[in-house]
Amino acid sequence: MKKNREAQLCLFSALLAFLPFASLLNGNSKYMVLVPSQLYTETPEKICLHLYHLNETVTVTASLISQRGTRKLFDELVVDKDLFHCLSFTIPRLPSSEEEESLDINIEGAKHKFSERRVVLVKNKESVVFVQTDKPVYKPGQSVKFRVVSMDKNLHPLNELFPLAYIEDPKMNRIMQWQDIKTENGLKQLSFSLSAEPIQGPYKIVILKQSGVKEEHSFTVMEFVLPRFGVDVKVPNAISVYDEIINVTACAIYTYGKPVPGHVKISLCHGNPSFSSETKSACKEEDSELDNNGCSTQEVNITEFQLKENYLKMHQAFHVNATVTEEGTGSEFSGSGRIEVERTRNKFLFLKADSHFRHGIPFFVKIRLVDIKGDPIPNEQVFIKAQEAGYTNATTTDQHGLAKFSIDTSSISGYSLNIKVYHKEESSCIHSSCTAERHAEEHHTAYAVYSLSKSYIYLDTEAGVLPCNQIHTVQAHFILKGQVLGVLPQIVFHYLVMAQGSILQTGNHTHQVEPGVSQVQGNFALEIPVEFSMVPVAKMLIYTILPDGEVIADSVTFQVEKCLRNKVHLSFSPSQSLPASQTHMRVTASPQSLCGLRAVDQSVLLLKPEAELSPSLIYDLPGMQDSNFIPSSYHPFEDEYDCLMYQPRDTEELTYSVPYGREKDVYRYVRDMGLTAFTNLKIKHPTYCYEMNMVVLSAPAVESELSPRGGEFEMMPLGVNKSPLPKEPPRKDPPPKDPVIETIRNYFPETWIWDLVTVNSSGVTEVEMTVPDTITEWKAGALCLSNDTGLGLSSVATLQAFQPFFVELTMPYSVIRGEAFMLKATVMNYLPTSLPMAVQLEASPDFTAVPVGNDQDSYCLGANGRHTSSWLVTPKSLGNVNFSVSVEAQQSPELCGSQVATVPETGRKDTVVKVLIVEPEGIKKEHTFSSLLCASDAELSETLSLLLPPTVVKDSARAHFSVMGDILSSAIKNTQNLIQMPYGCGEQNMVLFAPNIYVLKYLNETQQLTEKIKSKALGYLRAGYQRELNYKHKDGSYSAFGDHNGQGQGNTWLTAFVLKSFAQARAFIFIDESHITDAFTWLSKQQKDSGCFRSSGSLFNNAMKGGVDDEITLSAYITMALLESSLPDTDPVVSKALGCLEASWETIEQGRNGSFVYTKTLMAYAFALAGNQEKRNEILKSLDKEAIREDNSIHWERPQKPTKSEGYLYTPQASSAEVEMSAYVVLARLTAQPAPSPEDLALSMGTIKWLTKQQNSHGGFSSTQDTVVALDALSKYGAATFSKSQKTPLVTIQSSGSFSQKFQVDNSNRLLLQQVSLPDIPGNYTVSVSGEGCVYAQTTLRYNMPLEKQQPAFALKVQTVPLTCNNPKGQNSFQISLEISYTGSRPASNMVIADVKMLSGFIPLKPTVKKLERLEHVSRTEVTTNNVLLYLDQVTNQTLSFSFIIQQDIPVKNLQPAIVKVYDYYETDEVAFAEYSSPCSSDKQNV
């Protein structure tokens, strides 16, 4: 029953369509309303009304219907009999980003009514947003600078508020965010510093709009060395299988434009290089030297690849790789190319061939014959066949390889037109696997346009890409048939132009009709202004209405030049400058434009090419893309094609049937324009109902209507500005000669310019800038935004920073006193003439230098030549020694080469300064003497004796005295250098993080926080936050060395530490809340029913094992961390944890108190945080009995602490655990509720005095945890006792001799670290304090000691392989082997660091060091400038063996031994030293 009703409706609909004058209105009244199928809010939109043969006044109403109600768009009274008119309307913003709504069109008169409803998509107007970074790739520790650009679809700037912007690392951690950022005049610049050890890989900048839409931009973080030159491989785009030779050219050019001397290896492989080894073996290699232009061209014979004998090989490309090795340095860089393989020697390109044909209108074809390189082939005969039209023709290509054809379509009876063009004879091949020779041949199929009356119109355009602001002419060809034409005096053709989904232009053309004719044929021209609003694609629809209601139409798509209204130009004058010279940058744009400038070293773009910011890129942004909306099939009033249940008997009505999906009727023309039609006119081609049921998904896809006539065959590069750059202004006469201009180069940025400037009212801004010292080419561009003309982009401007000649120094990073090394100065002359040169090493009392060989101070350097001068240098002073080498071109009447040299006017002298570190021999020692001195009315003094051991290394002793007015002055100055130890694991990284929280809190509470200190501390917090995320596991936990690809186990203690630190840092920086939640969730899963926490992961600090057992000590620490994270004691996890501690305290009370000191200090602080004063007091009372009181100070020690070695000249610094315990007691006392009592403060002061004596010279302590906890205690004590006194203490230090220095401390310089060097070592000094107030005095003594035999806590053996010299010229590379075991008092050590210092002039072979991380006990390796660090999770009495290779970088004479140090990270007194020498160090070396 249902099927019968559907069939009746289908038949009724189809009959209506074929009744000549049938409509819902009487007579001949016709209606067509065209509206974009996709409408935008807050944007003027148009609806076009076409009312035809009205016989009464009507009202036209348009309304949008949604779930929220009905919104009337307009209500128009129409009195004209014929009307073509477009009305504007605006839709208010939607609550959601888009929604499908119903558009109702009602046309109502006194007698008749027409009403129709269709679905349209309404979308909120979205801004166009993109992000520009200052460069595409960053090194760890660098600053990421970026700007957010916001515009409307017309590219005018917007002041847009973005609720959120953030940066995601490769693990999708949100590492930085900004809230409520607003662009001003369309621009907002932000920056963010990467940590020193970020996760490497792709990062994302995400900008969140208020609509919820996200815009993203990617950049890369990786370690890299900028390439000094690029390699360009030039190969043909394609070859034919009949070619026997391929010419491959490889050129290597320095970034400053000069050729590279060296060697090139060219590899040519056929097939996919990622396939099997069989495919990979199909390669040829050619080696050659680069010529004077830095190039090498090779003719590679490819006959052995047998391309034409094997069908499969005919379709595989060649891959070319060229690796250039620079002469002298051995630096290698590569370039690549790809060569396609074609079956024919030439091919056809269809430049014009429409996808559809129209009966009676000629079908135009334009082709181009090109060779395998793409070059046109003139004067060649080409053939064309169109069998359905009975058309065969031949012609000769013109000088451009073009041929044109016009095919008469009148005789075509079917629905398709198959065109074949070919060159020479037709191919004899039938199967695709045929290997016989083929000639160019192409096919094109066009399908019929449907018209019931066989009437058509065709828009013909020859254009490729239309230039903006010009008139484009379109030819219209038409043929109209039908008896009803005779009653019309004229035919009116209407057209409209659309772009970006909106109707932009409308117009019409009238053609007079002679009375009584049954066919009208002709053509006319339409002139279309090409406006900016039409970029990048415009579509034009033309149609006319025949008297019987049939609509005849055609459309065409134009590619429009991607132009911008704001014309921007950036230039440098001069375009080539010396490093460090001044250059003039000029930017022109629309007046009052805000311009973002950028200039990047070309080396960066060689390393990581990026898409150039161009009009093409702008118009390809998501916000600029336009798409047609086709309603979903479930909408009941979106009718399908009309269908007939039977074939009409009138064969004149339907003489053919085009397959469904390929016919082109008016409905599809309208739909493909992006329009929805409301009409009672005939615009659809009916189809038999059974045909529609036979439609299958495998039918060929409908061809896109978005391409120009000829579809894919008329492709041209878009957005490329081919206009020449403006000529530089004429050069002025050279100025009078100045004294020799000397260049000293030391500034080498990767991004030179990153600024915002405003163009003045004349449209110009000019800036004087200093060129960096890098010898390279700078790539610069400007992005400008104007309220009047919108966005403008400059083309890339280049500035070549170049020097006619320059000098480069080769020297080691450091040497040990007594060693000698070769200092080499290489001078490169890039002038086309020879120059007399003078090279000079500036004399210094810090070293002696002897020229090597026959080198002269002056010599003649040939054109494009290089020369190296050498000196054998022996440093005489310790510390940093400067080496300054100058090279100068000198005027001389004598011949240089074969001519008298001409000295350049600029750049006649180049100077390079490098620093060498000269270290004393032996082992470094440091002692710090700290005191908290509080004076009242009477003067307070103490004596200080600086003693040196008898074996001290000569001249290595140095000392300084520091005075601070604040308890945290030293730590504030050195927050990133608190301890002189590596920071390579997750726990150690936190010493770079947590102290900044305490410093900020303390300074904020005491009102001493300055913007400078705040900025520095926040930067350190952000960097530490990034680094710590490297050590996060997927389950939310953290461990010392991270996930290790899912194999590592989270560490309970470290996770708690990170949790509390991140929670406290939230007050100062952005911390992604998910990291805190994840850590807490993971910790809660580790809690047992008893409330205690089970241990996960290794405890790398054995002090945690010193209490009752691991579980209680660990539980106390975690409870403390949870409470410091602002969790209330009522939280279920915290409440259970406190229950665990209470039960554990009862056990401890019954035991032997002395063995639980560490655990009790943690518990005291945990109960204090929970507000349980009773338990806090009980534990503190117990601890008071175990306190060690000496010299008016109080501290605690572990009974089982390691024994100190005998023979110390000074009392050694307390170990990490003792500092921790004492600091926890202070924290417990200061956390008393509601406030610490005078007794708490007094007792705390005694411990604070002891703690300050343990501080090192940087304000930290012996290790990481003690530094974090002690600084927390110091900051809380400082805040509790802080007062701004009106009286100022005066500190005096004087020696037993004549030395004396005074320091005044007041409120203005409390945080200032005042320091003076002490002249007499050894010597006796007196420190006195007068006035009133407390000061912190610290003396630091450093010296070196020769390596002595001792009884260390580690057995350490170091040797080289080979042991002895087996090369009379010296050992350039050898292996270092280490054997380590623990011999201390405990079963095993804590985490251990093995620090291997490099011999002077040697560097480690990094892959051999990295390979050690595969060993079981090696958690991490680091290669620093002069050291190799091995992180060992622990060491027992079992010997561990490691080895790696080092190689000579710079020859050094009289090589001194290098030191290897192995130490416990948390018990730094447990240390062992050894030394090693080069196998050839005892022999004379040729350096």
Curated annotation (Swiss-Prot):
Q: Which InterPro entries match?
A: A-macroglobulin_rcpt-bd, A-macroglobulin_rcpt-bd_sf, A2M/Complement_sys, A2M_N_BRD, A2M_TED, Alpha-macroglob_thiol-ester_cl, Alpha-macroglobulin_TED, Ig-like_fold
Asked whether the UniProt record includes Glycoprotein among its keywords, one would answer yes
Q: Which residues are glycosylated?
A: 55, 247, 301, 321, 393, 508, 760, 787, 882, 1004, 1153, 1324, 1437
Q: What is its main location?
A: secreted
Cell compartment(s), UniProt: Secreted
Tissue localization of expression is: Plasma.
Q: Which residues form the signal peptide?
A: 1-24
Region Bait region: list its residue ranges.
686-745
GO annotations of cellular component type:
extracellular space
Q: What does this protein do?
A: A proteinase activates the inhibitor by specific proteolysis in the bait region, which, by an unknown mechanism leads to reaction at the cysteinyl-glutamyl internal thiol ester site and to a conformational change, whereby the proteinase is trapped and/or covalently bound to the inhibitor.
Subunit structure as annotated in this protein's UniProt entry: Monomer.
Q: Which family does it belong to?
A: Belongs to the protease inhibitor I39 (alpha-2-macroglobulin) family.
| Name listed for the protein in its UniProt record | Murinoglobulin-1
Lineage, uppermost ranks? Eukaryota, Metazoa, Chordata, Craniata, Vertebrata
What gene is this protein a product of?
Mug1
